[in-house]
Amino acid sequence: MSLSAKDMAVVKGFWNKIAPKADEIGGEALGRMLRVFPQTKAYFAHWKDTSPNSPEVKKHGALILATIGDVVNRIENMTTVLGSLSDLHAFKLRVDPANFKILGHNIMVVICMTFPNDFTPEVHLSVDKFFQNFTLALSERYR
């Protein structure tokens, strides 16, 4: 599913609201994923604590949202922007790409909870399409 110019504009505009709370949203989304989908903890076995409020979860969640923010800023070149990260996840970390969809879903849940009045059906559609494309781009090196 490709992103239209309107979708890109909606995502970029909405990201301006998300950006000031990105660290908090990232930590909450990653913590939620680890709790609701405990099988994802296997990728973080080297952490001492994978509970939702642990410093490791919060720090990595913030890093994830910072990366997504970078992708939003260069949304037209998503696959190129995510190339090295796709290599890392495919060849070194060996993360099952199905987990990217799970994380995207959890990020959308937290965004919706954080901005209930702003997460309109139009925004939901565009953000969902963005995360579908993000997942495909991050999975590019798996092919």
UniProtKB/Swiss-Prot annotation:
Record's Gene3D superfamilies? Globins
Q: One cellular component GO annotation, for this chain's record?
A: blood microparticle
Keyword vocabulary terms for this entry: Acetylation, Heme, Iron, Metal-binding, Oxygen transport, Transport
Disulphide bonds annotated for this chain are none
Tell me the GO BP annotations in alphabetical order: hydrogen peroxide catabolic process
Identify residues that carry N-acetylserine.
S2
Query: Other notes on this protein?
Result: This fish has two hemoglobins: cathodic and anodic. The cathodic Hb and anodic Hb display small and large Bohr effects respectively. In addition, the cathodic Hb displays a reverse Bohr effect and appreciable phosphate effects.
The name this protein goes by in its record: Hemoglobin anodic subunit alpha
Q: Which organism is it from?
A: Anguilla anguilla (European freshwater eel)
The organism's taxonomy opens as: Eukaryota, Metazoa, Chordata, Craniata, Vertebrata
Q: Which gene encodes it?
A: hba
